[in-house]
Amino acid sequence: MHSILFATSEAYPLIKTGGLADVAASLPRALLKLGHDVRILLPAYESLLAKAASQGLKTLGEISLDDINLTLHQTRLPGTRVTVWLVDIPEFSARAGNPYCGADGNDWYDNHLRFYWFARAAEAIALNQAGLNWQPDIVHCNDWQTGLIPALLSLHPERPATLFTIHNLAYRGLFSYQAFGELNLPPAFWHHERLEFYGQMSFMKGGLAFADFITTVSPSYAQEIQLPEHGYGLDGLIRYRQESLSGILNGIDTDEWNPGKDKHLAATYNRRTLGNKTKNKLALQETLGLALNADVPLLGFIGRLVDQKGIDLILNQLPLLLEQDCQLVVLGSGFPHYEQRLREVARQYPDRVSVTIGYDEGLAHQIEAGCDIFLMPSIFEPCGLNQMYSLRYGTLPVVHAVGGLKDTVQERPLDNPGEDANGFVFHSPDALDLHAAILRALDAYRQPATWKQLQINAMNRDSSWEQSAKAYEAIYANLCS
């Protein structure tokens, strides 16, 4: 059994902007079930404090660092036994809105200071200098917001082991040399083998350079980020550290995403009652104002309407797709020009295309259950969660062969799908390649026996966090040996 400080900038349902929040909710819970002592460390954002208050919030005391005092609160991750510690400074708790940026979409001007103090709090806890009478064996850090923690702990000979997980290398936590000067960091950290990155400071690089071990969220992504085209200038450092790098697929919350018990659905179902899936399709069509037709293929997309998610590929092949007898459902928000183009298509084809701008958790579940085919043409995808939700719901994904999509979705010839074929894969980020994969999916849909076999294969896949947690457990054991 190990004691683990799990440092993260978000954790569902307390605060969420992306997939990191889902991981930070599920992995600690899975580790707790394996017998480990896990404490989550989060910034005390204003909105988070309001949610935590309903769970019960206890102030543990203050941590004095240099010329400021940080307040430490304690709560629990809702619905679990996982302890959560909250680092409270006014730059977190007295600022409404997004954790990282203002309403105008620009990063908060003082993010370097905000997450520096968060790292200093983690350092104090890790060294048992926070008055908690608790010290972890391992500090598990996540993405750039925690990248300074391994760097700071490297200054102490007697310290816990450090693990740094890359969830998305595209966000490198870049700040100016002037910002570096505002932090009480050793001048030696301004070096190309440490935090300096082409004249800037990179918090992400701090995690990569100083952590004892590095993981990322899928085996394929671990390989891709060692290449210049996917490394964002950090590929050389990652190649240098490849012996201390492992890719571990994320799991999904199989209680929250369970078609057999999902409260959001018109009808629950499992592998033996797949016929009930049609009831969800008809309910979704009715809810969204589409033509009611159990036989027409219904395609879905859920995600940010940004270039990374391949929404332009969907839009560019849409005229060809609409020549087919099918329907399309889109849920998401993002770049205004993508939102506008999608709205125009929905107005033009009101009984065939539905577009909901924003995010609705219930509707997301209904799309996963009601659709036949799920589109995930991401240009890059470190792990991806929606393809695993789709597999669990027997909704066959069409994916671009990158990152975690490549590791979870397999395509085989329809005349011999075997037991591992569970979707459709295209290999270049091109609208025509995506369209060809969709046509293969539509062809399979017209073969009911084959389609059902693919659905059963998909639903048989184990996407639970238990497998992922055991892989992390093995790394923890090696770090502590």
UniProtKB/Swiss-Prot annotation:
Q: Which PANTHER family match?
A: ALPHA AMYLASE DOMAIN-CONTAINING PROTEIN (PTHR45825:SF11), GRANULE-BOUND STARCH SYNTHASE 1, CHLOROPLASTIC/AMYLOPLASTIC (PTHR45825)
Q: What class of enzyme is it?
A: transferase
The EC designation for this entry is: 2.4.1.21
Against InterPro entries, the record matches this protein to:
Glyco_trans_1 (IPR001296), GS/SS (IPR011835), Starch_synth_cat_dom (IPR013534)
GO BP field = glycogen biosynthetic process
Record family assignment: Belongs to the glycosyltransferase 1 family. Bacterial/plant glycogen synthase subfamily.
Q: Which UniProt keywords apply?
A: Glycogen biosynthesis, Glycosyltransferase, Transferase
The name under which this protein is listed is Glycogen synthase
Q: Does the keyword Transferase apply?
A: yes
NCBIfam families per the record? Answer: glgA, PRK00654.1-2
User: What reaction(s) does this enzyme catalyze?
Assistant: [(1->4)-alpha-D-glucosyl](n) + ADP-alpha-D-glucose = [(1->4)-alpha-D-glucosyl](n+1) + ADP + H(+)
Chain residues that bind ADP-alpha-D-glucose? 16
Which CDD domains is this protein grouped with?
GT5_Glycogen_synthase_DULL1-like
Role summary: Synthesizes alpha-1,4-glucan chains using ADP-glucose.
Q: Which GO terms describe its molecular function?
A: alpha-1,4-glucan glucosyltransferase (ADP-glucose donor) activity; alpha-1,4-glucan glucosyltransferase (UDP-glucose donor) activity
- Pfam families of this UniProt entry? Glyco_transf_5 (PF08323), Glycos_transf_1 (PF00534)
**Could you tell me which pathway this protein works in?**
Glycan biosynthesis; glycogen biosynthesis
GO cellular component, alphabetical, reads: cytosol
